[in-house]
Amino acid sequence: MAREAEKDAAAAAEIPLLTPYKMGRFELSHRVVLAPLTRNRSYGNVPRPHAVLYYTQRATSGGLLVTEATGVSDTAQGYPDTPGIWTQQQVEAWKPIVDAVHRKGALFICQLWHVGRVSTNEYQPDGQAPISSTDRQITPDDSGIVYSKPRRLRTEEIPQIIDDFRRAARNAIEAGFDGVEIHGAHGYLLEQFMKDSANDRSDEYGGSLENRCRFVVEVIDAIVAEVGAHRVGIRLSPFIDYMDCVDSDPVALGSYMVQQLNKHPGFLYCHMVEPRMAIVEGRRKITHGLLPFRKLFNGTFIAAGGYDREEGNKVIADGYADLVAYGRHFLANPDLPKRFAINAPLNKYNRSTFYIQDPVVGYTDYPFLDEKDEGAATYA
């Protein structure tokens, strides 16, 4: 066993993604992070026992996992069977999942989410309109999904939404999570306030960059006050244009938000999504669009956005990121750190099973490497 451990350590030393890292108060054994991935298998918005297997398959000692996006209230939902953390039933359902991940020695972060206008009346309490920064509907696209016309939040209603995030963070800590990640990305409620294409308000939550970011800053402040900056991270995507949500100056937006994070000493991490990958000589290439934010942020910086093993190793070696979040590759390869250790081929993901409600197919049935393979490092 000692010889195996020495072999693993030697292998990791040559692979930047597999080197240890200290994130705040947490000691990580490698830098491969499970990105938050919506899986639509929490029937009735309650996490189910099959999630124990899904997450523990991807848990390694000293690894970092982020949950699928988890609703903060009954107005936060926009997709079928996504989990929540606003009721005691949901909190109790998360506890055995968190315990199982911890038994594998991994760290577990709960991503807190409100979809805003990315919803339809059928997902809303009493069939009401989804809430947003605006009353403008998302423009229908080729997907065939038509989101309902939203209702613009009144200024006096916003403190209640902030409190929903605060209570959800408290619930996450009660459920045993090591911390929370605020979902401030991909066109959902917080981005609907931040980005000027979706925010047409004339109150203190609209207009200037500072005003548009006020809502998310107040959410951050409330959660930090509730659970401590050392337990709070955030995901941001200033360059992304999902759900009719785009900003005319993404660098200014991202820079302003990072400066707000720096006001909280010990803030756990900033998790950012890359701009679209460039294609150079037939290969996807990182554009390094996140570099200004990396330089500005005082804490742990996580990069996400279509990385493979080679690019992940490069950005760690170059100091462009501290950690790299993997989504589809980790979904299809529950032993992804082990595969990276020996440069093993990866299972191909099946996009058609990403969002089905089956508790096994496309969820917990992706194969592991042969455990008897003599070359396999023991990231398990």
UniProtKB/Swiss-Prot annotation:
Query: What GO molecular function annotations does the UniProt record carry, in alphabetical order?
Result: FMN binding; oxidoreductase activity
Family statement? Belongs to the NADH:flavin oxidoreductase/NADH oxidase family.
InterPro entries per the UniProt record, alphabetical: Aldolase_TIM, OxRdtase_FMN_N, Oye-like
**Keywords of this entry:** Fatty acid biosynthesis, Fatty acid metabolism, Flavoprotein, FMN, Lipid biosynthesis, Lipid metabolism, NADP, Oxidoreductase, Oxylipin biosynthesis
Q: Where does substrate bind?
A: H183, G184, A185, H186, R276
Q: What does this protein do?
A: Putative oxophytodienoate reductase that may be involved in the biosynthesis or metabolism of oxylipin signaling molecules.
The active site annotation covers Y188
Cofactor(s) this protein requires? FMN
PANTHER family per the UniProt record, alphabetical: 12-OXOPHYTODIENOATE REDUCTASE 1, NADH OXIDOREDUCTASE-RELATED
Q: Which GO terms describe its biological process?
A: jasmonic acid biosynthetic process; oxylipin biosynthetic process
Q: What is this protein called?
A: Putative 12-oxophytodienoate reductase 4
Q: Which organism is it from?
A: Oryza sativa subsp. japonica
Among CDD domains, the record links this protein to: OYE_like_FMN
Q: Which gene encodes it?
A: OPR4
Query: Which residues participate in FMN binding?
Result: P36, L37, T38, A69, Q111, R235, G306, G327, R328
Q: What is the lineage of its organism?
A: Eukaryota, Viridiplantae, Streptophyta, Embryophyta, Tracheophyta
The EC code for this enzyme is 1.3.1.-
